[in-house]
Regions:
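Membrane-helix entry/capping segments
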Residues: 1-24, 56-57, 72, 115, ...
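Alpha-helical transmembrane segments of integral membrane proteins
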Residues: 1-25, 266-271, 299-326, 330, ...
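Short, strongly hydrophobic transmembrane alpha-helices
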Residues: 21-49, 53, 291-294, 336-341, ...
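Alpha-helical transmembrane segments
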Residues: 34-61, 68, 350-359, 433-462, ...
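Small-residue-rich transmembrane alpha-helices
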Residues: 44-45, 297, 333-405, 446, ...
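Membrane-proximal extracellular/periplasmic loop immediately following the first transmembrane helix
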Residues: 47, 54-104, 220-225, 451, ...
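Mid-to-C-terminal secondary-structure elements
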Residues: 107, 120-144, 152-279, 352, ...
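Interfacial "coupling" helices/loops that link adjacent transmembrane helices in transporter permeases
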Residues: 292-336, 699-741, 745, 795, ...
Length: 808
């Protein structure tokens, strides 16, 4: 194994060389550890979120089928009848299933008086678990009989619920528990690692809904899952389901026309809109590694220049060129190996920091760890870095002229023109890359500032929200829910410390929506498939005052209108402008295609509210008197602290009904802040990478000029001895350094104008070519570059001529 003996020999010699210059070795190892560690941490995040397969059977063949209505609804589920037709007529799926994640709109109350707790739940077909390849860890799954209307009242529980509320009782299977006041039998417990839909506590069979889903073609609750056959493709599935949808549109034009099908990998539903963000961050951290590599290359080149005489002697004694290159690469490999070992430690810390910074805004970040794939990436990155960093010093080792280097008068450390050009080019490159990163960070900062200045349409200060869930069995009618709410709000509004108490079925910026079609009386009547959609919210009479939503025209609801459930409506400005441009909306009457018997009169227009995101346009929205849902959001504006307000809610709810749980306590200011978590995450990481790049670039410029000054000490001393003023020496070195800085800034500006367009999707109200951002970072980098040039230049102007000449 001669190659191993040679490598061992080179490694021993390389270690001795590295130990002989501990400062340079330490700087190189730390620089590479920073670059490789940051890349490993970000790649680990990308792998966890984007590349890691879903924990389901044949995850790469699982797809999600959704619907959209052009111009009205971007993405929603399907009526159960439509799902059943697609499931029966398709030829591309091995198996299909449907689920309805009900948690967003309704609560499921577990337990009884004094121990009630609201649970998140989903209604699923009996094939739901089999298509995912999941089986209960205890008990059984749903059967076909459970799917029949009026089937047995049974449920499956999550492992977390089984431990939390049932105490991990092995005898719990087969026992009956109260869900929404009605008895349900627990038939199984799912494995601890099963979380779909996310955070679900309970799964119910579709039969518990009764017969209404089999008679309804307008409610879009059910999301369809399909497992593609091995020979089927996504495009083929899309085409086939398009054909089935066209048949449904012809058969049921009033309900199924104007609806389109979208087929996507199930992974896309988990990933959401973070794909672009993570790849941009990966590109940014890749730039950091390149900058780190340029610094290390420059350091190793300086070391190679200083060792020219050593390499010349070895060449003169018969060492082959490839042996010299191998020696240089081996030393580089040892440096990179040390950097990689430290990088894995930094990556572990960095990944934990990334998870903490994401604050729940990035999906699939549960149990973050460095997987085998991440270790493989680190090894590959280390090998690539070795080649990238080691080639230039290795080539320089065999490129030096042996006879010239061995001459008595030859100055050790005098670099060739090609080496000097390469080192200058590397500095220009890192200045350019640093400008790119700083530009991206500045754009994100400007975008985040714009986002923070957005008016959400309400006043979040001193607002606290809590949810309550009324059991369906105890409050089956709208009138009962409205009566409970009316009495609760009356009590809360008379509680000390509470200025205003109100209620709504959905809160702004909560991610919850409830769209529906609307027809205007006096205009052509459109069916549910073609009627324009608006967001609908049920609210109490003083909701607008409590939230601080301004009334623009007309009036808001009275207590009597809410209590009696009168058909009146308040709309936002967006709906008024969209439906009645240039006209008065007050007094207009609207009706839903789903309930043509309920005609509502518009009595007021209020300001727009950001319902889904601060950077999204407010949708047309219609408010109605509250009373439809069993889940209520209480909104309390008070002068006291939030804990006192929440305590008051607990007391008043318990006084009315101890079986009603109180949960999800939030401050509206926190809700607004949380809506910006993803943008804050992107900004902090990008800014951090930019600061690291700025530091490395400054060190790179300083290191190059320090090397130049050290190499030209004799020349500088001679100039001063012959009468050159120290200021001239300062100008000479500063000019040499600033030429590189300015050239790097120029190439960086051009690169930024071209590459920053890739960030357009991440920016809000800021152009990717924003001149203010680009100008600010250019000036900043020029100042930092000038400071980095000044320190070695000042050292040059203080060179003692006699000392310099004696040293030579």
């Amino acid at each position: 194994m001669k190659w191993f003996e040679d490598f061992y020999s080179d490694a021993r010699y390389g270690l001795r060389q590295l130990r002989s210059n501990p400062l340079l070795t330490t700087v190189c190892v730390l620089t590479l550890a920073l670059g490789i560690g940051a890349n490993t941490a970000v790649f680990s995040a990308i792998y966890l979120v984007l590349l890691r397969p879903l924990p389901f059977k044949d995850a790469d063949r699982l797809v999600l089928v959704t619907e959209y209505n052009p111009g009205n609804v971007a993405k929603t589920g399907s009526p159960l009848l439509r799902y059943q037709t697609r499931a029966a007529q398709n030829t591309v799926f091995e198996e299909t299933a449907a689920y309805w994640d009900v948690s967003g709109g309704n609560g499921l109350v577990f337990g009884g008086a004094g121990s009630a707790e609201r649970l998140q739940f989903s209604v699923v077909t009996n094939s739901f678990f089999s298509i995912l390849g999941e089986h209960p860890s205890m008990g059984r799954s749903f059967s076909q009989s459970d799917e029949l209307p009026g089937g047995g009242k049974v449920f499956l529980a999550s492992d977390a619920l089984w431990h939390r509320l049932l105490g991990g009782d092995l005898q719990a299977i087969g026992k009956t528990y109260r869900l929404d006041g009605e008895p349900y039998t627990l038939i199984g417990v799912l494995p601890p690692d099963f979380h779909f839909p996310s955070a679900c506590d309970v799964w119910l069979p579709i039969g518990m809904l009764g017969t209404w889903p089999l008679q309804d073609r307008v409610s879009h609750q059910f999301w369809m899952l399909g497992r593609l056959r091995p020979e089927a493709t996504l495009a083929r599935a899309q085409a086939e389901l398009n054909g089935i949808q066209e048949q449904l549109a012809r058969a049921f034009p009033t309900t199924d026309a104007n609806w389109h099908v979208h087929v996507q990998p199930l992974l896309e539903e988990f990933v959401g809109n973070v794909r672009i963000s993570l790849w941009v961050l990966f590109g940014a951290v890749g730039f950091v590694l390149l900058i780190a590599c340029t610094n290390v290359i420059n350091l190793l080149l300086a070391r190679a220049v200083a060792r020219e005489k050593e390499f010349a002697i070895r060449a003169a004694l018969g060492s082959a060129r490839q042996r010299l290159v191998r020696q240089a690469l081996t030393e580089t490999f040892l440096v990179v190996a040390g950097g990689t070992a430290l990088a894995l430690v930094l990556a572990k810390v960095g990944l934990s920091a990334i998870v903490a910074l994401s604050a729940g805004s990035i999906p699939r970040f549960e149990q973050p760890h460095l997987s085998g794939m991440v270790f493989s990436f680190s090894v590959a990155l280390a090998l690539l870095t070795t080649l990238l960093v080691g080639v230039a010093p290795g080539l320089h080792a065999v490129d030096c002229n042996s006879s010239e280097s061995l001459q008595v008068g030859h100055r050790s450390g005098s670099a060739s023109r090609r080496t000097t050009t390469l080192r200058n080019a590397l500095v220009v490159c890192e200045i350019s890359l640093t400008l790119l990163l700083l530009s991206g960070a500045c754009l994100m900062l400007r975008s985040f500032q714009q986002l923070r200045e957005v008016d959400p349409g309400f006043l979040p200060e001193h607002l606290v929200t809590v949810k309550i869930a009324l059991p369906d069995a105890l409050y089956p009618k709208t009138e009962q829910r409205a009566a409970f709410l009316h009495e609760l709000l009356r009590s809360l509004n008379s509680t000390p410390g509470v200025q205003l108490a109100a209620a709504s079925d959905r809160l702004p910026l909560s991610g919850e929506g409830n769209w529906g079609g609307i027809n205007v009386l006096g205009r052509p009547v459109l069916d549910s498939a073609h009627a324009p959609s608006v967001e609908g919210r049920g609210v109490s009479a003083n909701y607008f005052s409590a939230m601080g939503i301004p009334l623009l025209r007309g009036r808001v609801f009275t207590e009597d209108e809410v209590a009696e459930g009168r058909h009146v409506a308040v709309i936002n400005k967006m709906m008024a402008d969209q439906f009645w441009p240039g006209a008065d909306a007050i007094g207009q009457r609207v009706v839903s295609p789903y309930h043509p018997e309920n005609v509502s009169e518009i009595i007021g227009v209020v300001g727009n509210v950001k319902d889904f995101a601060l950077d999204a346009q407010a949708p047309p929205e219609m408010y109605s008197p509250y009373g439809w849902w069993n889940t209520m959001n209480l909104v309390l504006r008070g002068s006291s602290d939030s804990a006192s307000l929440v305590s008051a809610v607990h007391s008043e709810v318990a006084a009315l009904d101890k079986e009603v749980p109180v949960y999800e306590v939030k401050r509206m200011e926190d809700l607004v802040s949380h809506s910006m978590e993803r943008q804050r995450f992107e900004l902090v990481l990008l800014a951090l990478f930019a600061m690291v790049a700025l530091l490395l670039a400054a060190v790179g410029v300083y290191g190059l000029l320090a090397f130049v000054v050290n190499r030209r000490t004799h020349e500088i001393g001679l100039r001063i001895a012959l009468g050159a003023h120290p200021r001239n020496v300062l100008a000479l070195v500063m000019t040499q350094g600033m030429k590189l800085v300015l050239f790097g800034l120029g190439t960086g500006v051009v690169s930024s104008l071209m590459l920053m367009r890739l960030m357009s999707g991440l920016l809000y109200r800021v152009s990717s070519t924003d001149p203010l951002s680009l100008g600010a970072v250019t000036v900043l980098l020029a100042i930092i570059g000038a400071l980095a040039c000044f320190m070695p230049a000042r050292r040059a102007m203080r060179v003692d001529p006699m000392t310099a000449l004696r040293c030579e």
